[in-house]
Amino acid sequence: VIPLFQVMHLWVFFIIGGESMNKTQDFTKGVIWKQLLFFFFPILIGSFFQQLYNTVDTIIVGQACGTNALAAVGSTGNLTNLVVNFYVGLSTGASVVIAQYYGAHNKDKIHQAVHTSYMLAIVSGIIMMLFGLFFSYQCLDAIGVPHDILNDASLYMRLYFLGMIPGAIYNIGSGILRAVGDSKRPLYYLIICSIVNVVFDFVLVVILHKGIAGAAIATFIAQTVCAILVTIQLMFSKDVYQLTLSKIKFHLPVLKKIVKIGAPAGIQSTMYSIANIVLQTHINAFGTQTIASWSVYVKIDALFWMAMAAIGAAITTFVGQNYGAHLYDRIQKGAKTALAIALTMAVSLSVILCFGGSYITKLFSSDPAIINQCQSLILFLMPFYFSYCCVEIFSGTMRGCGESFKPMLLVCIGICVLRVAWVTFISPHYPTLKGVVISYPITWFTTSFLFIIYYKHFKKDHFGA
C-alpha cells in the first residue's frame, strides 16, 4: 500500500512541475476577475470530484443494490453533512487566519497557524469519528428513517464516520494550500482519490457484493489517500507553510483566532444541515420512494452548491490576503466581482439543469416514478438559485475580514429558524412534498435580503465606505 501512495505522490509531483513551479498566488495585486476565476475553477472541479465520492456510491448502490439501499444511503446525507460541515467550517477558520498572515508576510505566525491547524484536525476528527460510531443508529431513528432501511443506513453511516480523521486532515491541509493561493494541488489529489474511490466501489459492491458497506469502505479508502497526499505535499514544501510532524501542537493565541473564525463558520454550515434534517424528517413521512427521489435530487442539486462553495472559498481567500495587507478598496472590488460571477453561474445552472436534469436523474435510477418525481422537484426549485448568491458572497467577504459571528446569526435567523418554522406551522396545511420544499427558495430570498442590509453597515464599519 505504501509504495502505491509514493507512486501517486511522484506522479502528482511531476504533473504540477515539482517545487520549481510556484503554485501560490498573491491576491494583493493583479486583475481581480482573472485571479478569482483562475482560483475558483480548480476549487469547483475539486468539489466536483469530492462530491463524486458519494455520487458514485449512490449510482452504484442504486443500480446494483436497488431502491431500498439507495434510500438507506440517501437518508444519511443530512446527518453526515451536519458533522462534516462543522469541520469544514473549522478549516475555513484556519484558511482565513493563514491567508491574513500570508497577506501580511508574517512567517512566524504562518508556521504556528499551520501546525495548530493540523492538531485541530486530528482532535476534531477523533471526536467526530467516535460520535458517528456510537450514535449513528439513534440519530437516524430520531429523524424518522423508516425501519425497513434503518439498519442499512446505520451501517453505512458508521463506516462513513471511520473516515472523519483523514477527512478532517485533508480539509485542513487543502485549506492551508488555498490560503496561500494554491487551489491546483488539492484538485490533483482529489482526481487521484476519485479514481481510487471508483475502483474500490466497483470491486467491493459489484464484484464482491458487499452492498452499501462496500460503498462506505471505498469512500474511507479514498479519504485516507487524500489525507496522505496533502500531508506529504506540506511536509516536502520549501515555502513558509511547510509542515513538520514533530512540531504539530496547539499554539493557543493562534488557536483562539482560528476557533473565533472557524467555530461560527462551522456552526453556520451546520445550521443548513440542521434545517435540512428537520425537512428530511418531514420528507421521510412520504415513504421510501419519495426518500429515494429526494436523495437523487440532492445529488443533482449539489452541482449548484459546489459552485457556490467554490466562489465562496475564492472570495474568502482573496479578502483574507487583502485584509492582512490593509487593501480595503480592493476587497470591495473583489466582492462585487465575485457576486457577478456567482449570479452568472446561478442563472446558467438553473437553465442547464431544468432542461437536462432528467438525463442526469436516469444515471441514479431506472424507476420511472423516481425519475418523474425528481424532474418535478428540479423544475420547482432550481429556477430560484439566483436568490441565494448574496448569502455566499457577503458571508465569505465578512469571514475573510475575520467577522464570522454576525454571518452565523443571519443564517440562523434566515435559514434555520425560518425553515423550521415553515415546516412546523405552514406546511402541515399543505401536506405535499412541494409544500415542504418550497421553504428553500423562501429562505434563500429572506437570508439574501438580510445580508444585503447588514453588508452596507459592515462596509461602513470596516472600510469607511
Predicted regions and their residues:
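Short alpha-helical transmembrane segments in multi-pass integral membrane proteins
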Residues: 1-40, 98-163, 207-263, 319-384, ...
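Small-residue-rich hydrophobic transmembrane alpha-helices
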Residues: 2, 70-130, 167-186, 293-357, ...
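N-terminal transmembrane alpha-helices
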Residues: 27-64, 78-93, 97, 122-129, ...
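Transmembrane helical elements of multi-pass membrane transporters/channels
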Residues: 38-57, 159, 170, 193, ...
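Helix-terminus/linker motif at the lipid-water interface of multi-pass membrane proteins
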Residues: 52-71, 140-147, 203-210, 270-299, ...
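Interfacial/gating helices of multi-pass transporter permease domains
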Residues: 61-81, 147-152, 212-213, 254-261, ...
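Hydrophobic transmembrane alpha-helices of multi-pass small-molecule transporters
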Residues: 82-85, 197-202, 227-231, 303-306, ...
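Short runs within selected transmembrane alpha-helices of multi-pass transporters and secretion channels
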Residues: 91, 160-178, 186-194, 215-230, ...
